[in-house]
């Protein structure tokens, strides 16, 4: 009898342990797969591609790669003497046409005062037409002067905002063309996180919800707030042929990969460039409020930690 009870007890304990283990594994799996989190997140920032508006030789480079610069600080300078001469030439043209316009204005005024009693109507009209032509030439010369002045000002390339110079690839003596990107500027205090959430987890993601961001390779947890969720992503399963007909890719009905949707998260505190734009992180959306770690069970703490490793 005792042997039977002992065997029954062992069997019952084993069954209970198996059931508990199954429940724990099931809960862990649900928590792992359905809670709003992702390891596919990246730090991002506002980046300005700086390109000159004029062409010419670079005469001076005032910054070095990865330098923190202030708004308005000179980055590099392009061939100012050439554009200074162009401005002087345009100013000389303006001065010439101003004198010529004054002369033609006086001539036309004199003929208009004398009238047809002293000369023919054709001569009066001709003087007025010449005056109008000179005035148009003067306006054109003034526009050319203003453009030359603008070009001269734009030979000095300045930082459009506070930030870090990155990927600087210009050097003194190098010829640069108008519109070619010379350097990128990562704006200071513009960092945010783009978390690519699976569509199955978007139920728990709403603007205003709190989020935890853990940079890859770091134990530091940053706080943030969900700013927005992308309104759409590219449909990779459907394209159009050259006749405009829809082309649908074949797929396996029992294998469906969840689409990833970008979620923008604003950081509570800017971290400067400790984690540069493009580096990866793990993001957990905790809901309307921050997670209270003191209330977490051992299981939840382990689950949060395991998510760092995928």
UniProtKB/Swiss-Prot annotation:
<comment type="similarity">
    <text>Belongs to the membrane fusion protein (MFP) (TC 8.A.1) family.</text>
</comment>
<dbReference type="Pfam" id="PF00529">
    <property type="entry name" value="CusB_dom_1"/>
</dbReference>
<dbReference type="GO" id="GO:0005886">
    <property type="term" value="C:plasma membrane"/>
</dbReference>
<keyword id="KW-1133">Transmembrane helix</keyword>
<dbReference type="InterPro" id="IPR022871">
    <property type="entry name" value="PHBA_efflux_pump_AaeA"/>
</dbReference>
<keyword id="KW-0812">Transmembrane</keyword>
<dbReference type="GO" id="GO:0022857">
    <property type="term" value="F:transmembrane transporter activity"/>
</dbReference>
<dbReference type="InterPro" id="IPR043602">
    <property type="entry name" value="CusB-like_dom_1"/>
</dbReference>
<keyword id="KW-0997">Cell inner membrane</keyword>
<dbReference type="Pfam" id="PF16576">
    <property type="entry name" value="HlyD_D23"/>
</dbReference>
<keyword id="KW-0813">Transport</keyword>
<keyword id="KW-1003">Cell membrane</keyword>
<dbReference type="InterPro" id="IPR050393">
    <property type="entry name" value="MFP_Efflux_Pump"/>
</dbReference>
<comment type="function">
    <text>Forms an efflux pump with AaeB.</text>
</comment>
<feature type="transmembrane region" description="Helical">
    <location>
        <begin position="12"/>
        <end position="32"/>
    </location>
</feature>
<keyword id="KW-0472">Membrane</keyword>
<dbReference type="InterPro" id="IPR006143">
    <property type="entry name" value="RND_pump_MFP"/>
</dbReference>
<protein>
    <recommendedName>
        <fullName>p-hydroxybenzoic acid efflux pump subunit AaeA</fullName>
    </recommendedName>
</protein>
<dbReference type="InterPro" id="IPR032317">
    <property type="entry name" value="CusB_D23"/>
</dbReference>
């Amino acid at each position: 009898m005792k042997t039977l009870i002992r065997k029954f007890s062992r069997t019952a304990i084993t069954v209970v342990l198996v059931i508990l283990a199954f429940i724990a594994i099931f809960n862990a799996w649900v928590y792992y797969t359905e809670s709003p989190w992702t390891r596919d997140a990246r730090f991002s920032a506002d980046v300005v591609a700086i390109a000159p508006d004029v062409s010419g030789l670079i005469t001076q480079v005032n910054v070095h790669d990865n330098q923190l610069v202030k708004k308005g600080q000179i980055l590099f300078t392009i061939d100012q003497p050439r554009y200074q001469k162009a401005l002087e030439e345009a100013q000389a043209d303006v001065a010439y046409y101003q004198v010529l316009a004054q002369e033609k204005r006086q001539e036309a005024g004199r003929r208009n005062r004398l009238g047809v009693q002293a000369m023919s109507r054709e001569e009066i009209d001709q003087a007025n037409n010449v005056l109008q032509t000179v005035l148009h030439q003067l306006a054109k010369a003034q526009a050319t002067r203003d453009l030359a002045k603008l070009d001269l000002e734009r030979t000095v390339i300045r930082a459009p905002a506070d930030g870090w110079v990155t990927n600087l690839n210009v050097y003194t003596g190098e010829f640069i063309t108008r519109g070619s990107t010379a350097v990128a500027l990562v704006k200071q205090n513009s960092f945010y996180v783009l978390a690519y959430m699976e569509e199955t987890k978007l139920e728990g993601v709403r603007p205003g919800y709190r989020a935890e961001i853990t940079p890859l390779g770091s134990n530091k947890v940053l706080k943030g707030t969900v700013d927005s969720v992308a309104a759409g992503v590219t449909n990779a399963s459907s394209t159009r042929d050259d006749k405009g007909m829809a082309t649908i890719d074949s797929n396996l009905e029992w294998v469906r990969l969840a689409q990833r949707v970008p979620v923008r998260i604003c950081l509570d505190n800017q971290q400067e460039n400790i984690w540069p734009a493009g580096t990866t992180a793990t993001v957990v959306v905790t809901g309307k409020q921050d997670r209270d770690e003191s209330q977490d069970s051992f299981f939840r703490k382990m689950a949060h930690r395991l998510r760092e490793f995928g």
